[in-house]
């Protein structure tokens, strides 16, 4: 599998994170995790400006375009609130996106997974410095070196990307033809068989969804319960997240969708046609298969940042970035600290307009999403766009929204 395909598979969703980083005026290194070496504490050094609601609405008024059919934006915090939509949510009816509807959150699922693993660490049911091979013997190739659990969470494991799998060739046409195929997490992890490690664990950072598949299997091994059960009992139910779920592997449905996105692909005669991709396999599972809504993601991040889900030691890990370089990663490659790690055990850190924000991007074909907040929650933003392709052409819209939301 080529490097281009690997980039499409795990990091096409990173376009939003890269855009936010591109807007950054600077980032600094955060405190280190036990698994990854030294780091320094980061402080927010710019106040959040008043929310320019008109600027956000102007961006949304430019939709639909050939690259983005619709979008929703949810902003909260003491510096201003807004719920707004733009473009078309359902091309069949022409209706606008539903600001209260659900969408496939993609890699934002990783934050839920990391939170559960950190909770298990707080309960002394696993140790972040213990090799994952201790808990899951035989899962990884025997040739792989010991990989600490914490290194899975902050992407310093050095795991390879995996060979041919459910991501195909990364094109919209391939996805449309295979969108209902389901892969088990074990089968996805097995695509690493025969591959070499990308780097020595703990020496660099490379965004890789394979880390989170292994972390999800770790949750099941340690608890004896399904991953979905643990997310439900530990996060969804306590916080009252009524729109958030981990779909069953054989359930492609999306109930009460915010939008019914369509991908543009070549028809039989070569002319473009649009295919509704609302229903699709949730095979990304703990790595990227969850469903949620803007309100639920806001509630989750608010509880997470306020320490309602994690005790102090694990909360510190959530806001800790290892002091290591990146390794062939689309993340952390812009701004004054380009080439240095920007991801913690669950979150990504960047700056926009001098304001330090933490959060996560995530996408599935048909959706490009993000949830970011200042650590003091003076501003939280959730966005969900509906791109018509898989080539990152929605990036300019995200840039405009980021600039409008954070000034």
Regions found by a protein language model. Give the residues of each.
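Hydrophobic (often cysteine-bearing) scaffold residues that line and stabilize catalytic clefts
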Residues: 52, 56, 105, 109, ...
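Residue-level preference for non-acidic, small/hydrophobic
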Residues: 60, 79, 113, 117, ...
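Catalytic loop of the DD-peptidase/beta-lactamase superfamily, centered on the K-T-G motif
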Residues: 2-3, 30, 34-85, 275-407
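Short, surface-exposed loop or secondary-structure junction motifs
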Residues: 144-356
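Short, solvent-exposed loop/turn elements at domain surfaces
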Residues: 82-84, 93-95, 161-163
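Short active-site loop at a secondary-structure junction
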Residues: 67-69, 93-150, 199-208, 285
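Secretory targeting and sorting signals
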Residues: 1-36
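Solvent-exposed serine/threonine-rich low-complexity stretches and specific carbohydrate-binding patches
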Residues: 87-89
């Amino acid at each position: 599998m080529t490097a281009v395909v690997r980039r499409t598979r795990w990091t096409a969703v990173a376009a939003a994170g890269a855009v936010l980083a591109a807007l950054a005026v600077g980032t600094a290194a955060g405190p280190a995790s036990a698994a990854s070496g030294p780091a320094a504490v980061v402080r927010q050094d710019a106040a959040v400006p008043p929310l320019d609601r008109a600027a956000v609405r102007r961006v949304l008024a430019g939709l639909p375009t050939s690259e983005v059919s619709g979008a929703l934006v949810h902003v909260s915090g003491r510096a201003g609130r807004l719920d707004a939509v733009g473009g078309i949510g359902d091309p069949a009816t022409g209706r606008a996106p539903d600001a209260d509807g659900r969408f496939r959150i993609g890699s934002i699922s990783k934050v839920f997974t990391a939170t559960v693993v950190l909770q298990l660490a707080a309960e002394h049911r696993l140790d972040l410095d213990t090799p994952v091979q201790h808990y899951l013997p035989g899962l990884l190739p025997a040739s792989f070196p010991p990989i600490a659990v914490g290194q899975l969470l902050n992407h310093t494991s050095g795991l390879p990307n995996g060979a041919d799998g459910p991501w195909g060739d990364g094109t919209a046409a391939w996805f449309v033809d295979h969108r209902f195929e389901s892969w088990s997490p074990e089968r996805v992890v097995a695509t690493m068989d025969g591959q070499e490690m990308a780097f020595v664990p703990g020496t660099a950072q490379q965004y890789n969804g394979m880390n989170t598949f292994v972390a999800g299997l770790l949750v099941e091994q340690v608890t004896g319960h399904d991953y979905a059960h643990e997310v439900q009992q530990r996060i969804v139910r306590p916080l009252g997240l009524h729109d958030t779920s981990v779909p069953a592997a054989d359930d492609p449905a999306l109930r009460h969708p915010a939008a019914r996105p369509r991908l543009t692909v070549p028809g039989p005669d070569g002319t473009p046609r649009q295919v509704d991709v609302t229903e699709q396999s949730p095979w990304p599972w703990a790595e990227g298969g969850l469903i949620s809504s803007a309100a639920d993601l806001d509630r989750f991040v608010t509880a997470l940042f306020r320490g309602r889900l994690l005790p102090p030691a694990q909360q510190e890990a959530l806001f800790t970035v290892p002091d290591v370089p990146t390794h062939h990663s689309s993340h952390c490659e812009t701004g004054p600290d380009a080439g240095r790690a920007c991801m913690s055990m669950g979150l990504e850190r960047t700056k926009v307009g001098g304001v330090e924000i933490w959060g996560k991007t995530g996408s599935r074909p048909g959706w490009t999403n993000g949830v970011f907040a200042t650590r003091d929650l003076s501003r939280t933003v959730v966005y969900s766009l509906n791109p018509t392709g898989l080539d990152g052409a929605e990036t300019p819209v995200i840039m405009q929204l980021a600039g409008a939301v954070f000034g």
